[in-house]
Design a protein with these regions (language model features):
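Charged, amphipathic alpha-helical segments and their flanking helix caps
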Residues: 1-26, 50-139
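A short acidic/basic microdomain associated with nuclease active sites
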Residues: 25-37
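A short beta-turn/loop motif at secondary-structure boundaries
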Residues: 36-41, 121-125
C-alpha cells in the first residue's frame, strides 16, 4: 500500500477546502504559516493549514491543523483600546468548517474527519483563531 507524505496530505486538504462553503466564506489560505513580512500586512479573515503528525504504520493516521483566523474586535473602554475575540464570527466559521470537513472520503482507502477544535488568541497579532484538527485515516 502506498502511503501519503505530509506534503501530499496538505495538498489533499487544500484542494478539498477549495471546493467547500468554507472557502467561499474565507478564500484567503496559506500553507504552514501566515505571511510575516512587513510588505504584507495582515487584514481580514484567512486560513492556515499545517500538519501535526503523519504516523505511518499498519494504518496511516495523519493530523492536519485547519486554523481559521478572525480579526479581534477592538472597542475603546475608558479611552483604552481593548481586544476581544469576535466570537459570533468564529462560531459561524467553525460551524461552516465542521460541515465542510466532516466525514469525507478521498478515495476508497482514505477518509478525513474533524477530530477536535479550540479557540486560541494570538499575542503578537490582533487575531483569534479557531484551531480545527482534522484526521486522515487510511483503511
Amino acid at each position: 500500500m502506498i502511503r501519503k507524505t505530509s506534503a501530499e496530505i496538505l495538498s489533499l486538504v487544500w484542494d478539498w477546502i477549495r471546493t467547500t462553503p468554507l472557502y467561499e466564506a474565507v478564500p484567503t489560505m496559506y500553507l504552514d504559516h501566515f505571511p510575516t513580512s512587513a510588505s504584507h500586512k495582515l487584514s481580514g479573515e484567512f486560513i492556515v493549514l499545517t500538519t501535526l503528525s503523519n504516523v505511518i504504520g499498519e494504518q496511516q493516521v495523519a493530523t492536519v491543523n485547519v486554523n481559521i483566523y478572525v480579526p479581534d474586535t477592538t472597542p475603546r473602554i475608558n479611552k483604552e483600546e481593548q481586544r476581544y475575540p469576535d466570537n459570533n464570527r468564529l462560531s459561524e466559521l467553525t460551524k461552516i468548517a465542521y460541515d465542510s470537513l466532516r466525514c469525507y472520503p478521498l478515495d476508497e482507502r482514505y477518509f478525513f474527519d474533524v477530530l477536535d477544535e479550540s479557540l486560541i488568541s494570538e499575542a503578537e497579532i490582533p487575531y483569534t483563531l479557531s484551531n480545527i484538527k482534522v484526521q486522515l485515516k487510511n483503511y
